[in-house]
Amino acid sequence: DDDDDDHTIEHFETF
């Protein structure tokens, strides 16, 4: 779940 729009790049592994 990408609830961190600000850290889309930082949390790339979240995808």
UniProtKB/Swiss-Prot annotation:
Indicate where this protein is primarily found.
Answer: secreted
Q: Which GO terms describe its cellular component?
A: extracellular region
Where is it located? Secreted
Top-level taxon of the source organism: Eukaryota
Give the record's keywords alphabetically: Secreted
Q: What is this protein called?
A: Unknown protein 2
